[in-house]
């Protein structure tokens, strides 16, 4: 028997639940991050299998949502869970789910479904889901990509997703030969350059693709944008 850890006397500032590692390569991720004294960012990322489209939904929700989740955390003594033994039952092709809780005082509690989690943990998850569903009802849904127009050439540039100030983009080589792409990555809103990064160089074999990303300092406003890499471009709309 391990000695229970004292309850954490500090504000919850971040929590996430990530499920990945299944046979089909899918991934789901939810996170809540305290932004200021009034609001938190609730982000949802879902991909059914490895090559399927990514669905992103993000909301500003009341920061008291994190306080309510902290109450559930304390109710079920989740600070004890990292010391639980690993489960003796596992499925090789099943996804693993990880849970993380970060606190203002620097404490970080992390555990996963590989552990022998007690049955009461399912009750805990139901309570958290109910809290989040109510938060969304009164939350502010944030703009995201509603349409895009990828370049239609042998070399195609398209947007994979826009998530937490990150734009993931895909370069695809439909030609029958290896190509080299060398250019500066630029992002425009209308005629205004809002992001520029040093030159990148990609070597793509025929019928291959490359996934990469850029990280922005601030969220994109509603509007029309153009992502440019050398001579290839992709326009998209945030709404």
What are these regions (language model features)?
Residues 2-22, 79-151:
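Short, well-ordered, aromatic-rich surface patches in folded extracellular/luminal domains
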Residues 24-30, 54-56, 92-96, 180-183:
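Short, surface-exposed coil-to-beta transition loops
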Residues 43-56:
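Acidic/histidine-rich, surface-exposed loop or edge segments in extracytoplasmic proteins
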Residues 57-58, 198-204, 216-217:
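Beta-strand-rich interaction surfaces with strong enrichment in secreted/lumenal proteins
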Residues 62-89, 164-170:
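Charged, amphipathic alpha-helical segments
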Residues 66-68, 115-130, 191, 203-211:
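Short, surface-exposed linear segments at secondary-structure transitions and domain or protein termini
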Residues 143-202, 228-239:
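Primarily secretory-pathway and cell-envelope proteins
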Residues 207, 216, 221-225:
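A glycine-anchored, Pro-Gly-centered beta-turn/N-cap motif
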